[in-house]
């Protein structure tokens, strides 16, 4: 039993020898599968350019199907599809330009930012115009009485939960 060659494009295997491999790699099924694979990674601008240069496929327009599929010499896109594709190309172009035109942020470190923030907060007046409001905990409407709630849904006690000195988790 000899080695076997597996073609990822066609999802099939065959006996690996020079004749069989050449025959497969030059075969129509392999070439179609390879084209479909690489077409998945084409950008919208290249697809739009190709589709605009093609004439509409009559069979696809009449029946909605074409025997040639993605290998057809004619376009299977409607005018609306072409418009949507051109809008997508324009948006991608704008996004690339925006990234190039956007000013780069200066390299900074967290420590520098924290120092500036501390200085800003210390220089700010300590008395604020608005007093700090504390929020009052309220249970949602329609819940059962507090005594019937499980501990995980009850409000924390006023001062927080007491610390347990020797608690083991696990």
Curated annotation (Swiss-Prot):
Keyword DNA repair: no
Keyword list, A-Z: Metal-binding, mRNA processing, mRNA splicing, Nucleus, Spliceosome, Zinc, Zinc-finger
InterPro entries: U1-CZ_Znf_C2H2, Znf_C2H2_sf, Znf_CCCH, Znf_CCCH_sf
Record GO biological process: mRNA processing; RNA splicing
A Pfam family matched in the record: zf-CCCH
SMART domains: ZnF_C3H1
Disordered, as annotated region: 150-170
C3H1-type Zn finger ranges: 51-79
Superkingdom as given in the UniProt entry: Eukaryota
PROSITE patterns xrefs: ZF_C3H1
Protein localization: Nucleus
Main location: nucleus
Keyword Phosphoprotein carried by entry: no
Cellular component annotations (GO), alphabetically ordered: nucleoplasm; U12-type spliceosomal complex
Protein known as: Zinc finger matrin-type protein 5
Gene name in the database record: ZMAT5
């Amino acid at each position: 039993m000899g080695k076997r060659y597996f073609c990822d494009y066609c999802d099939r295997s065959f006996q690996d020898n020079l004749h069989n491999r050449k025959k497969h790699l030059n075969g129509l099924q392999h070439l179609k599968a390879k084209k479909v694979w690489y077409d998945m990674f084409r950008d919208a601008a290249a697809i739009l350019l190709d589709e605009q240069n093609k004439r509409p496929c009559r069979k696809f327009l009449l029946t909605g199907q074409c025997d040639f599929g993605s290998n057809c010499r004619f376009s299977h896109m409607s005018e609306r599809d072409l418009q949507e594709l051109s809008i997508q190309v324009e948006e991608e172009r704008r996004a690339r330009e925006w990234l190039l035109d956007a000013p780069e942020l200066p390299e900074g470190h967290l420590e520098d930012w924290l120092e500036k923030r501390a200085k800003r907060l210390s220089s700010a007046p300590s008395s604020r115009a608005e007093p700090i409001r504390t929020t009052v905990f309220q249970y949602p409407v329609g819940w059962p009485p507090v005594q019937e709630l499980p501990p995980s849904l009850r409000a924390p006690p006023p001062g927080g939960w007491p610390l347990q000195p020797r608690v083991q988790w696990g």
